[in-house]
UniProtKB/Swiss-Prot annotation:
It comes from Caldanaerobacter subterraneus subsp. tengcongensis (strain DSM 15242 / JCM 11007 / NBRC 100824 / MB4). The keyword Transcription regulation does not apply. GO terms for biological process: DNA-templated transcription. This is DNA-directed RNA polymerase subunit beta'. Its EC number is 2.7.7.6. GO terms for cellular component: DNA-directed RNA polymerase complex.
Length: 1183
């Protein structure tokens, strides 16, 4: 029995004609499909039941045998085997071709494999195959050469001249003969010799030919199998024909394509039998070749075959390629049972780990569970009556549903699922209505809001799946973001506003300065209405210190007392050992969004996830309650326009008039005038904003919303009540006419018109960049999907040195941020020689702070970049799992997490321009395209010139151009670089530079850096550049995610000289495999190969993976499969994608084999077993 778990690998290769006949159940001889009167398949046609099996279960074509009892009988009348109709999905047929036909993938692919083997150009090959020219097969004793092309006229001339002394042919037959004659071993030796001797184009061509020849030798494929004598016909249920309502038929395009092949083949047979003239036969053969081409890959050569309405027909290749192809549509994106979707509404009364499930949906989803429980409880006699009860929705069904649903988690997912927090598990609570209720705190993780978003529900069925959902996916366990380890469940909007209002204080309100003997008394006074929630009061606090009660009077407000009741009082914000501060409230200042984040971070670090979930719920209750009580809302009167605005605008007008006057007098250029005007207006806008902020009361609702981080920003307040300021035109150039009004006053027509440019551009950009970002994520996932934590420690001594990342004087990422949660690669010692962190220990927050204080600027840490694990990475090189704060577990799919961590904010960034309404500001265009350029390792736009040698800079300027010469006096070498017009220099005359330093401003080409400075420099450069883009957008991503992607980009070695190994020059080979091969060679006393590390872009790297299934499902499906088939590749099923494609459990997390092989044994059984074992051992010892 074929079981999915039973196989380790999957192999692809070329099929020989014998193999195709072996697969087949019979030959398809007629182009007929089904009889339109009886609607039964025609015999020997494309749907023939004799070949492919019966259309109805257990029933032959003529109806002589019906029922299961005749299973396996072959009907003597119609020849159909009595069996299940399902076999029509697996039984294949074949067509015996009257003339051989070339397989288009191997002719037209790039590079043309057939062309390389025969050493013919693709054009020459095409001429022969499509009957334009003759090719000499055997020159005999004539002056012709083998494989020489002859036109019709030349052929006739030579025929008259030499008669039968030479042989030439055309079409696939001739090519087949040439392919059969190839001696691969001999050719391989010749090519290897040629590679050693030749140079330039000739050598490159020889290397490419050798690659193909070697592939055929290693895989055991024969070259002539690229020519088809027999064409396989795929099972009929994979190319179905169905009857539509009006009696017409809809059929798969493949049937049309097969029909054309069969018609032409039959006609060719007839012509050959009749002995028709050569020219007619040749034309028919060419048509047959074209028909087979169209079937395999329509449109690859010439015009595609079209169906009704000029639509190109979908060929076998099209069935596989692209988003709608077999790989991405059906193998990686299956639809699943036990799922539903509905609109979401907010459920503030839920706990963090709960969600509201509509009753009718729950009943349908849990139907089998409910039916079983009904039978178990004796409410129904058997499953059939239980099913009827559920379908009629009897009242007793609801009680049973409640029981079934209890403790059975469900998964909620919102598309687009940009990171793993887009699917989480919740405990369902039945609700009336037809909407799913979602807890407000999980919205940020899903990026969900309640303006009509929909979510999907999935039910984990098996016990294992339920356990995983409960322990790994429950929302209460996913409080931290995997990308940076910060809490993702931070309160937002109303909750923030409520807490802000609650912890504010105000002067001159009732009850100010009163004393209370305890917090409880203060609360009572507030509830009875004697004091205001914001009044500054004195309260006597009592605490137990070292077993004795002590008390002290502190100043606070009732609001702060209420807020502190919701959070633990040991978070370390207050020094509890100092008697001065020991009695203070943990949080005694104004709480805004960032402060809430810090509080939750501490709660998680100190008390763990369960307590954090409780605290979150308490903060949520408080927030909603007090934002309601405060009744904060926006009204037009809250938008206070500052009095100074008029004066500031007048000053600006005068300033602009002065600038214009200077320009007219010719004192400044047009460019300077423009810059100055823009600068003036920007300053004015700033001043107006400052005046506005000073005017607003601190209890002004709009100010509170922005200041607390609940909603809106300073920028938006400026537009409401200050002035909108400068706008950009469609090209992105800033229009020098500012918008003086704000939305409170209203814009005039011209101002409104100017502002539409920015708004429209914002929307268009958003739409485009969302797509770009999604595509970037897809490539990142594909390149890193097989990186899984596979071992404890790879044992390497290597590591990378990290220091803070700076851009000019600005620190982009602090050193402590970069080393927290990483493993030290060597002892970290302060100046006095005290060890702060030992080698192979994790650096935590406190230690990182110590390192900072000790003034250490460079630290060596373990990194995925230097990890020696063959597949994936080890725990030590990866360090802390950011989502849990512990050392990463074996089996964690860190590659996919890395891709999501980088891709998810990509989309966030892309969606950012949209909210400001298009006010001129920093656009992310340097953002996303820059990240893409780095990961694809492209030559960047605005290239910086870098020096290849170290030395002193000499700058020479002649009339037309500037040159920089770098002189290395020690080794007496110098190099001169031409500086393009308009570049800004980064160096001064006489300055000393290192090899690899930039001479001009701009981005460095990573490939040049790799050549000059080596691997470490490139890795560090890519990492820092990617970080700069994200940090400038205010997005934090941990280094290790970017390191994993860079590791995947640099996994391969490009072989330069193969030595005596079997590798080919110019071949890309896995670094570890390269080292292995060399080790083997050295052991045998042979010459090892030399090579250099290659830097591949993520697309290239994803296509260069060992798994052909993963590569084929990514991009360029036909090219990948062609290549894999010739090489006879074996896919070892190591990554995640390949296993999903063939339907095995993925080898990550609980699917890792080390976890799958665990069996659960009862304790008593185990003890018994051990006793028996012990007795056996004792008996053996005594004997």
């Amino acid at each position: 029995m074929f079981k999915l778990k039973n196989f380790e690998a999957i192999k692809i290769g070329l099929a020989s004609p014998e193999k195709i006949r072996e697969w087949s159940r019979g030959e398809v001889k007629k182009p007929e499909t089904i009889n339109y009167r009886t609607l039964k398949p025609e015999r020997d046609g494309l749907f023939c039941e004799r070949i492919f099996g019966p259309t109805k279960d257990w029933e032959c074509h003529c109806g002589k045998y019906k029922r299961v009892k005749y299973k396996g009988v072959v009907c003597d009348r119609c020849g159909v085997e009595v069996t299940r109709s399902k076999v029509r999905r697996e039984r294949m047929g074949h067509i015996e071709l009257a003339a051989p036909v070339a397989h288009i993938w191997y002719v037209k692919g790039i590079p043309s494999r057939m062309g390389l083997l025969l050493d013919m150009s693709p054009r020459a090959l095409e001429k022969v195959l499509y009957f334009v020219s003759y090719v000499v097969i055997d020159p005999g004793d004539t002056p012709l050469t083998k494989k020489q092309l002859l036109s019709e006229k030349e052929y006739r001339e030579y025929l008259e001249k030499y008669g039968n002394r030479f042989r030439a042919g055309m079409g696939a037959e001739a090519i087949k003969e040439l392919l059969q004659e190839i001696d691969l071993e001999k050719l391989s030796k010749e090519l290897r010799a040629e590679i050693k001797e030749s140079t330039g184009q000739k050598r490159v061509r020889a290397i490419r030919r050798l690659e193909v020849v070697q592939a055929f030798i290693d895989s055991g494929n024969r070259p002539e199998w690229m020519i088809l004598e027999v064409l396989p016909v795929i099972p009929p249920d994979l190319r179905p024909m169905v009857q539509l309502d009006g009696g017409r038929f809809a059929t798969s395009d493949l049937n049309d394509l097969y029909r054309r092949v069969i018609n032409r083949n039959n006609r060719l047979k007839k012509l050959l039998d009749l002995g028709a003239p050569d020219i007619i036969v040749r034309n028919e053969k060419r048509m047959l070749q074209e028909a087979v081409d169209a079937l395999i890959d329509n449109g690859r050569r010439g015009r595609p075959v079209t169906g009704p309405g000029n639509r190109p027909l979908k060929s076998l290749s099209d069935m596989l390629k692209g988003k709608q192809g077999r790989f991405r549509q059906n193998l990686l994106g299956k639809r699943v049972d036990y799922s539903g979707r509905s609109v979401i509404v907010v459920g503030p009364e839920l706990k963090v780990y709960q969600c509201g499930l509509p009753k009718e949906m729950a009943l349908e989803l849990f139907k089998p569970f409910v039916m079983k429980r009904l039978v178990d409880k004796g409410l129904a006699q058997h499953i059939k009556s239980a099913k009827r009860m559920v379908e009629r929705v009897r009242p007793e069904v609801w009680d049973v549903l409640e029981e079934v649903i209890k403790e059975h988690p469900v998964l909620l997912n919102r598309a687009p699922t940009l990171h793993r927090l887009g699917i989480q598990a919740f405990e369902p609570v039945l609700v009336e209505g037809r909407a799913i209720k979602l807890h407000p705190l999980v919205c940020p993780a899903y990026n969900a809001d309640f303006d009509g978003d929909q979510m999907a529900v999935h039910i984990p069925l098996s016990m294992e799946a339920q356990a995983e959902a409960r322990f790994l996916m429950l929302a209460a366990n996913n409080i931290l973001k995997p990308q940076d380890g910060k809490p993702v469940m931070t309160p937002t909007q109303d909750m923030v506003l409520g807490c802000y209002y609650l912890t504010a204080d105000e002067d001159g309100v009732p009850g100010e300065g009163k004393y209370f003997s305890s917090p409880e008394e203060a609360l009572m006074a507030y509830q009875l209405g004697y004091i205001h929630i914001h009044a500054k009061i004195k309260v006597k606090m009592t605490r137990e210190i070292n077993g004795e009660k002590k008390s002290k009077v502190i100043e606070t407000t009732v609001g702060k007392i209420i807020f502190n009741e919701a959070i633990p009082q040991d978070l370390g914000f207050v020094d509890r050992n100092n008697p001065e501060t020991a009695f203070n409230l943990e949080i005694n200042d104004l709480v805004d969004k960032s402060k809430l984040g810090k509080i939750l971070d501490r709660v998680y670090r100190i008390h763990g996830p369960t307590k954090t979930a409780e605290t979150l719920d308490k903060i949520k209750e408080l927030g909603f309650k007090y934002s309601t009580k405060a009744a904060i809302t926006i009204s037009v009167s809250d938008m206070v326009i500052p009095k100074e605005k008029e004066k500031l605008l007048k000053e600006a007008d005068e300033m602009v008039a002065k600038i214009e006057a200077q320009f007219r007098r010719g004192l400044i250029s047009e460019e300077e005038r423009y810059e100055k005007v823009i600068e003036t207006w920007n300053m004015t806008t700033e001043k107006v904003t400052e005046a506005l902020m000073a005017t607003l009361d601190k209890f002004n609702p709009i100010f509170m919303m922005a200041h607390s981080g609940a909603r809106g920003s300073k920028n938006q307040i400026r537009q409401l009540a200050g002035m909108r300021g400068l706008m950009a035109d469609p090209s992105g150039r800033i229009i020098e006419l500012p918008i003086r009004s704000n939305f409170r006053e209203g814009l005039n027509v011209l101002e409104f018109f100017i502002s539409t440019h920015g708004a429209r551009k914002g929307l268009a950009d958003t739409a485009l960049r969302t797509a770009d970002s999604g595509y970037l994520t897809r490539r990142l996932v594909d390149v890193s999907q097989d990186v899984i934590v596979r071992e404890e420690d790879c044992g390497t001594d290597e590591g990378i040195y990290v220091e803070e990342i700076r851009e000019g004087n600005e620190i982009i990422e602090k050193l402590s941020d970069r080393i927290i949660g990483r493993i030290a690669a060597e002892d970290i010692v302060d100046s006095e020689g005290n060890v702060i962190v030992r080698r192979n220990e994790m650096i935590n927050e406190e230690e990182a702070e110590k390192i900072d204080k000790a003034g250490i600027t460079r630290v060596k840490i373990r990194s995925p970049l230097t990890c020696r694990s063959r597949h994936g990475v080890c725990r030590m090189c990866y360090g802390r799992d950011l989502a849990t704060g512990e050392l990463v577990n074996i089996g964690e799919a860190v590659g996919i997490i890395a891709a999501q961590a980088i891709g998810e904010p990509g989309t966030q960034l892309t969606m950012r321009t949209f909210h400001t309404g298009g006010v001129a500001g920093v656009d992310i265009t340097q953002g996303l395209p820059r990240v893409e350029e780095l990961f694809e390792a492209r030559k960047p736009k605005g290239l910086a010139v870098i020096t290849e040698i170290s030395g002193v800079v000499r700058i020479n300027e002649s009339k037309k151009r500037r040159e920089i010469t770098v002189v290395d006096e020690e080794n007496n070498i110098s190099k001169t670089y031409l500086i393009p017009y308009g570049s800004r220099l980064k160096v001064r005359d006489g300055q000393w530079v290192q090899a690899g330093d930039e001479l001009t401003e701009g981005s460095v080409n990573p490939h040049d850096l790799l050549k000059i400075k080596g691997i470490y420099a490139v890795q560090s450069y890519l990492l820092q550049e990617v970080q700069k883009v994200y940090r400038l957008q205010g997005v934090e991503i941990n280094d290790k995610h970017i390191e994993i992607i860079i590791r995947q980009m640099m996994k391969k070695v490009k072989v330069e000289d193969p030595g005596d190994t079997s590798m080919l020059p110019g071949e890309l080979i896995d670094m570890f495999k390269f080292e292995e091969e060399n080790k083997k060679a050295i052991e045998k006393g042979l010459r090892p190969a030399t090579g250099r590390r290659a830097l591949l872009g993520i697309t290239k790297a994803a296509l260069a993976t060992d798994s052909f299934l993963s590569a084929a499902s990514f991009q360029e499906t036909t090219r990948v499969l062609t290549d894999a088939a010739i090489k006879g590749k074996v896919d070892p099923l190591i990554g995640l994608k390949e296993n999903v494609i063939i339907g095995k459990l993925i080898p990550a997390g609980t699917g890792l084999s080390r976890y799958r092989n665990i069996t659960v044994v009862k304790k008593e059984d185990q003890e018994k077993k051990e006793e028996v074992k012990k007795e056996a051992v004792d008996a053996k010892a005594s004997s």
